[in-house]
């Protein structure tokens, strides 16, 4: 019989009634949208319920219109409070860090952080647009283009370091060797100290203590901005001006700098430019676009038809320069190509015309390494190339060689390319492979003859200046005479073998005033010739000053036969300086525009400034070289310095670099021309100097913005220790140490 189910006893029934209640379904105040639409159970977890997590749905909670009293769990509110508290704590810590980092930047005029912000490049650019964009051009009145399909560079300087670190102001130390103008000026200043019986003057102006010493100048970094405030469009590396402006700048470059330094093939450059212009610059090589911007930067720097104000031209040029930096600055350190080498050469040339002399030298080192890595020095790398490519690779290497000698002379540092590496690398003269028929290649001829002239300069640097190596061995007067005579013979032989269309011109020649491309090259060659002649004969002028300005009995010794010969040969240096000033003065007084035959203004500035220093040396010789003043020579030297002042005043307008050279030559010439140190003599000398010049110091616009380049000049060339205990200054009769350096921003 089946077993009957047992009925629970009364005790068991009572226990079940008083026991814990059974679990009921927990109701939530608001279900998520997915669970409500599926009509499934929702556990109400935030931010995502378990059902949505398992099914991969987006969990969203949206109260309905009738949900006026939504129940929110206490644990959810507690979790929100903890998260808010954590965020507030992190923000407070970050705020404390930023306070320590930004507190030194409150003073915008003196803060190193502020200066670093100004000198930094453009901030991190936004992504390039997907189509050509029209915006304001650098001129502010024209439409512009923005190249696309380019990777935007990242500016690391614009990223905060987050370390609450404050950088102190850096100092720049530079060595200027025996061939530099700075070293020659140091010799003149020591001779001035001897002439005025300064107790702090060296006991003897021997070559080991003067010409052979290291001239190291510590100068502060410039605190002024290098350009005007750029618009967001200008800060884009891919931004370009209007087509009309680009065409004008291209024509200007290939008519000026492209003729003097013909290392870029114009036809190839214009072909690529036209292709990019037709496609709206939607596809362009980064290296080519960077080179194009450097071409624009150079052209706009000496485009005086755009504006006569150098400040405005520089602001415009600096926009293109920064764009080129944004495109190729980092790329040039890891990519080897001919376009990168061209870009770097243009950077070096551009920096020579600005206050970026340190950048010019540093970038030139990168030019050398990139060119050698590309094999421009080797003929074997050209076997698979066509004649045009071979020729322009060779021209690029020759331009680098010429720049090597120019920079080595200007700053007095060892050259990087020995003459042995130029074997069979001379550019072809006559007809270029790019020209058709019998058309002459004027830029190619000019580069070929310039190359041979710079080979003579290279020999002068090695033989006469010890390759600018701070060497202990010194040449005696006989060795200087022999070296100068041999190099002068080579230089004159070079001039005699010039082709008819590139012959040198004299002061009275009509070539100076007939503005043609060939005549401009002839004038430039003439200035280069006289500048090299100054370099060859300057050791003899230095030897003369060393002999004349010796303290004690050495100054009264009878001059030897060799010293007499050195003095006679030193006049060749003075003659070349005089011809340089006369030629430039003849051109600039008739035509002061950029279309004259002088070429790029900053190379003319270098030639005239070098010649002016030589004239100052001859003025010092005439005033203090003997017991009797050579009044005729002193008067003629002052007349030449007056011409040089006219050149500086007309060479450019509102140009701080030109004004710095003018101010420096003025003050140095006053120091060389004062016979006594009394206030009356100083006043008389200043009056005489002003009467011989065409412009007055008061009329010159030399504001605070222009003082920074002069401060660099003065701190590099002046050594205040020379005039220790020299109570009277040769200028204005003021205390030299306590007054001159406080009144003039020369530094120390």
From Swiss-Prot:
- Location relative to the cell: Nucleus
Bias category Polar residues: which stretches? 11-21, 429-438
Where in this protein does the record put region Disordered?
1-26, 116-160, 417-438
Sorted alphabetically, which SMART domains does this protein's record hold?
Fungal_trans, GAL4
Q: Which GO terms describe its biological process?
A: DNA-templated transcription; positive regulation of transcription from RNA polymerase II promoter by galactose
How does a null allele present?
A: Decreases, but does not eliminate the ability to metabolize 2-benzoxasolinone (BOA).
Q: Which GO terms describe its molecular function?
A: DNA-binding transcription factor activity, RNA polymerase II-specific; RNA polymerase II cis-regulatory region sequence-specific DNA binding; zinc ion binding
**What SUPFAM superfamilies does the entry give?**
Zn2/Cys6 DNA-binding domain
- The reply on keyword Metal-binding is yes
Q: Specify the inducers.
A: Expression is induced in response to 2-benzoxasolinone (BOA) exposure.
Q: Please, what other remarks does the record include?
A: Fusarium verticillioides possesses 2 unlinked loci, FDB1 and FDB2, necessary for detoxification of antimicrobial compounds produced by maize, including 2-benzoxazolinone (BOA). The FDB2 cluster arose as a duplication of the FDB1 cluster with rearrangement and expansion by incorporating additional genes.
By what name is this protein known?
Transcription factor FBD3
Q: Which residues bind DNA?
A: 32-59
Its job:
Transcription factor; part of the Fusarium detoxification of benzoxazolinone cluster 2 (FDB2) involved in the degradation of benzoxazolinones produced by the host plant. Maize, wheat, and rye produce the 2 benzoxazinone phytoanticipins 2,4-dihy-droxy-7-methoxy-1,4-benzoxazin-3-one (DIMBOA) and 2,4-dihydroxy-1,4-benzoxazin-3-one (DIBOA) that, due to their inherent instability once released, spontaneously degrade to the more stable corresponding benzoxazolinones, 6-methoxy-2-benzoxazolinone (MBOA) and 2-benzoxazolinone (BOA), respectively.
Q: Which GO terms describe its cellular component?
A: nucleus
Query: Which InterPro entries does the record match to this protein?
Result: Fungal_SecMet_Regulators, Transcription_factor_dom_fun, Zn2-C6_fun-type_DNA-bd_sf, Zn2Cys6_DnaBD
């Amino acid at each position: 019989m089946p077993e009957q189910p047992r009925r629970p006893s009364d005790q068991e029934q009572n226990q079940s009634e008083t026991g814990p209640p059974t679990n009921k379904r927990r109701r939530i105040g608001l279900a998520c949208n997915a669970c409500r639409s599926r009509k499934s159970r929702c556990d109400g977890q935030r931010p995502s319920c378990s059902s949505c997590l398992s099914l991969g749905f987006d969990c969203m909670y949206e109260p309905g219109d009738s949900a006026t009293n939504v129940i929110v769990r206490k644990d959810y509110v507690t979790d929100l409070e903890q998260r808010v508290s954590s965020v507030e704590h992190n923000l407070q810590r970050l705020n404390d860090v930023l306070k320590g980092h930004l507190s030194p930047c409150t003073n915008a005029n003196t803060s190193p952080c502020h200066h670093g912000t100004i000198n930094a490049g453009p901030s991190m650019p936004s992504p390039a647009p997907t189509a050509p964009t029209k915006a304001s051009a650098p001129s502010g009145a024209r439409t512009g283009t923005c190249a696309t399909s380019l990777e935007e560079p990242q500016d690391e300087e614009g990223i905060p370091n987050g370390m609450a670190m404050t950088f102190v102001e850096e100092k720049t130390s530079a060595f200027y060797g025996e061939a530099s103008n700075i070293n020659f000026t140091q010799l003149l200043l020591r001779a001035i100290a001897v002439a005025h019986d300064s107790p702090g003057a060296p006991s003897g102006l021997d070559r080991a203590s003067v010409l052979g010493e290291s001239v190291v100048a510590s100068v502060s970094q410039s605190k002024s901005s290098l350009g005007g405030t750029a618009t967001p469009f200008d800060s884009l590396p891919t931004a370009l001006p209007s087509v009309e402006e680009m065409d004008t700048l291209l024509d200007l470059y290939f008519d000026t700098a492209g003729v003097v330094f013909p290392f870029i093939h114009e036809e190839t450059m214009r072909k690529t430019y036209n292709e990019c212009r037709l496609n709206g610059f939607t596809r362009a090589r980064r290296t080519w676009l960077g080179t194009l911007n450097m071409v624009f930067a150079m052209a706009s720097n000496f485009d005086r038809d755009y504006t006569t104000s150098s400040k405005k031209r520089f602001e415009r040029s600096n926009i293109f320069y920064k764009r080129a930096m944004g495109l190729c600055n980092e790329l040039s350190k890891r990519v080897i190509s001919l376009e990168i080498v061209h870009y770097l050469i243009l950077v070096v040339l551009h920096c020579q015309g600005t206050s970026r002399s340190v950048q010019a030298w540093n970038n030139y080192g990168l030019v050398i390494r990139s060119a050698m890595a590309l094999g421009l020095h080797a003929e074997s790398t050209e076997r698979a190339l066509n004649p045009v490519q071979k020729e322009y690779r060779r021209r690029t290497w020759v331009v680098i060689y010429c720049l090597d000698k120019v920079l080595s002379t200007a700053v007095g540092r060892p050259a990087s390319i020995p003459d042995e590496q130029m074997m069979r690398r001379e550019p072809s003269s006559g007809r270029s492979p790019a020209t058709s028929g019998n058309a002459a290649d004027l830029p190619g001829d000019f580069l070929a003859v310039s190359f041979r002239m710079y080979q003579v300069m290279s020999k002068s640097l090695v033989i006469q200046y010890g390759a600018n190596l701070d060497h202990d061995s010194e040449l005696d007067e006989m060795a200087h005479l022999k070296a100068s005579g041999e190099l002068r013979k080579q230089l004159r032989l070079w001039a005699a073998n010039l082709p008819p269309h590139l012959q040198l011109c004299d002061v009275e020649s009509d070539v100076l005033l007939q503005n043609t491309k060939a005549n401009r090259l002839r004038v430039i060659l003439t200035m280069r010739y006289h500048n090299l002649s100054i370099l060859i004969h300057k050791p003899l002028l230095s030897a003369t000053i060393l002999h004349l300005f010796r303290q004690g009995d050495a100054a009264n010794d009878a001059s030897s036969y060799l010293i007499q010969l050195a003095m006679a040969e030193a006049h060749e240096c003075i003659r070349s300086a005089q011809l340089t000033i006369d030629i430039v003065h003849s051109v600039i007084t008739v035509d002061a525009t950029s279309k004259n035959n002088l070429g790029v203004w900053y190379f003319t500035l270098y030639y005239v400034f070098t010649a002016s220093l030589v004239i100052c040396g001859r003025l010092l010789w005439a005033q203090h070289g003997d017991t009797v003043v050579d009044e005729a020579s002193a008067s003629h030297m002052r007349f030449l310095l007056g011409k040089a002042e006219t050149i500086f005043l007309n060479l450019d307008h509102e140009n701080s670099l030109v004004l710095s050279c003018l101010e420096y030559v003025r003050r140095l010439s006053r120091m060389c021309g004062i016979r006594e140190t009394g206030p009356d003599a100083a006043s008389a000398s200043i009056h005489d100097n002003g009467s011989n010049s065409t412009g007055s110091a008061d009329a010159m616009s030399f504001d605070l913005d222009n003082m920074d380049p002069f401060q660099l000049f003065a701190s590099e060339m002046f050594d205040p220790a020379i005039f220790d205990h020299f109570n009277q200054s040769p200028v204005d009769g003021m205390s030299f140490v306590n007054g001159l350096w406080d009144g003039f921003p020369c530094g120390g």
